[in-house]
Amino acid sequence: MSAQIDPRTFRSVLGQFCTGITVITTVHDDVPVGFACQSFAALSLEPPLVLFCPTKVSRSWQAIEASGRFCVNVLTEKQKDVSARFGSKEPDKFAGIDWRPSELGSPIIEGSLAYIDCTVASVHDGGDHFVVFGAVESLSEVPAVKPRPLLFYRGDYTGIEPEKTTPAHWRDDLEAFLITTTQDTWL
C-alpha cells in the first residue's frame, strides 16, 4: 500500500501541468448555468468524444446531468474575468455575460476561442469527481484571427509568449511560432 498523499502537495504537484481554461455551460429549467473547468480533454475522434470532470457536489453538474447536454467554451487570454466569474460562487454567473444559444440550446459565451456542443454520453466514477464523456454534436469553426488561449499554471493565469529571440514576424503569428523549427527542434 502506498503512503498517504498530502492533498496540498498533490494539488501543488499537479499545478505544474499547464492547462487551458474552459467554461462548461447548459440551460436547465430555462436558466443558464455554467462553471470554469480545467479538467477538459479530447477523448476520441471516431466517434467524436470529449471529457470533463466536475466535482460530485457541483450544482452546475447537477443541471448538466438533468439537461443531458452541455457546451464547452474555450476561453481566450482576454477572458480572465469570465473565468473568475464562472469559478466563483456568484449565484448569477451570466450577469453581464454576452451569450447566444448553441444548436442544442446551451450557452455559447461571446468572444470564446472555440465551442464544442455536446450531449452527455456517459458518466463514470472518479473519486470525488465524475468523469463525463460527451458526444460532440457540433462545434465552432477555427477562427480566422487566432487569439491566444487562457492558460492556468501553478495556481495562476498564464499565456503563450514566444521567446524574445524568436523573429518578430513569427512572434506576431502564434501559429507560425508553434510550428517553426530550429536546430533545437525535436522533430
UniProtKB/Swiss-Prot annotation:
InterPro entries, per database record: Flavin_Rdtase-like_dom (IPR002563), HsaB (IPR054682), NADH-dep_flavin_reductase (IPR050268), Split_barrel_FMN-bd (IPR012349)
Induction of synthesis: Induced by KstR.
Keywords, in A-Z order: Aromatic hydrocarbons catabolism, FAD, Flavoprotein, FMN, Lipid degradation, Lipid metabolism, NAD, Oxidoreductase, Steroid metabolism
Pathway(s) annotated for this protein in UniProt: Lipid metabolism; steroid biosynthesis
SMART domains: Flavin_Reduct (SM00903)
Entry EC number(s): 1.5.1.36
GO biological process: cholesterol catabolic process; steroid biosynthetic process
Pfam families to which the protein is assigned, alphabetical: Flavin_Reduct (PF01613)
Enzyme's top EC category: oxidoreductase
Sequence positions that bind FAD: 32-36, 38-39, 53-55, 59-60, 85-86
Catalytic reactions of this protein: a reduced flavin + NAD(+) = an oxidized flavin + NADH + 2 H(+)
Keyword match Oxidoreductase: yes
GO terms assigned for molecular function: flavin adenine dinucleotide binding; flavin reductase (NADH) activity; FMN binding; oxidoreductase activity, acting on the CH-NH group of donors, NAD or NADP as acceptor; riboflavin reductase (NADPH) activity
Residues where NAD(+) binds: 152-155
Keyword Lipid metabolism: yes
Further details from the record: Cholesterol metabolism contributes to the survival of M.tuberculosis in the host by helping the bacterial multiplication during earlier stages of infection and to the dissemination of the pathogen in the host.
Function description: Catalyzes the reduction of free flavins (FMN or FAD) by NADH. Subsequently, the reduced flavins diffuse to the HsaA oxygenase subunit.
Subunit structure: HsaAB monooxygenase consists of an oxygenase component HsaA and a reductase component HsaB.
Family under the similarity heading: Belongs to the non-flavoprotein flavin reductase family.
Protein name: Flavin-dependent monooxygenase, reductase subunit HsaB
Organism: Mycobacterium tuberculosis (strain ATCC 25618 / H37Rv)
Recorded name of the encoding gene: hsaB
